[in-house]
Amino acid sequence: VSSPQPPLGERPWAYSAFPVTVGAIRRLSPNFLRVTFFGEALQHFAPWGLDQRIKLVLPLPGDAPRDFRLAEFGLLEQPTPHPSDWYQRWRLLPEGERNVLRTYTPAATRPKVRELDVDVFIHEPAGPASAWALAARPGDHLVITGPDARNGWTGYGIHWQPDAHDRFLIVADETAFPAARNIVASLAPGAEADLLLDIDDAADDLVSGDLAVAGAVSALGSTETTTPAATVRLVVAERGTTTGPDDLIGVERAVRRWGAEHGAAARDDPRWYVWLAGESGATTRIRRYLTSELGIAKDRIAFLGYWRIGGALVG
């Protein structure tokens, strides 16, 4: 549970812009690259974990990673302007003259050594973030926006906010795997979670590798395992093939199968909490199913989009 939000006037450092440099790039799996950033300002980057939302401020359209330029929209003013201020300035710039923004969750933060890891899933065809990561080299510059530890509010940019809940449904596609991994690692002793992963290549599963899972898990098949603290039932829903007469693909079909088995309990038992993350359209459809058809209260569902099919997801 996050610390209470301070009054607005006491929040000059809840959110900051961090100039960073690429320190290392490592391929984790067929479609994941880990980019390690360093920068003196990262000593103040808050290591809140979970599904902490950050922005990568990418190069201007047409610029190579090593030619990074930041458009004039006030992002590096001190203290960093409120997001609504600099974002409005950014939106007023012509599209070809403003830096591309993309949402991520840190894989790891190490403020003491001024480092931050971001695991980038490489989409095909490559969008701006994927193209940047594939071309990036140590020494390239970037700006990251995220939480500033000097404020002390541990809830900024975090959607995962369970209170007294200890039964969880966690649904994620590859873009949300770093956040899902953080969340699973945070589960308290005695918690139980159903973890549904939407995936194209099982080798890209960065989440269940930390669990005691033996062998592969077929589409819509499940296996039960334990973390040091919690019991996790894992379902890997492979993308690309339909899994039933309703033509639903991958994790959306898996969620409906889960709903048929557990939906009534999740609706009636206030201990249940749901977290959905990935492609914006899919998370919206799943949330609508959970609330409209299963009747789960909206205040027990957190959902966020990391990307959108067919267009940019910013803001």
Q: What annotation goes with each model-predicted range?
A:
Residues 1-315:
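Extended, composition-driven regions rather than compact fold-specific motifs
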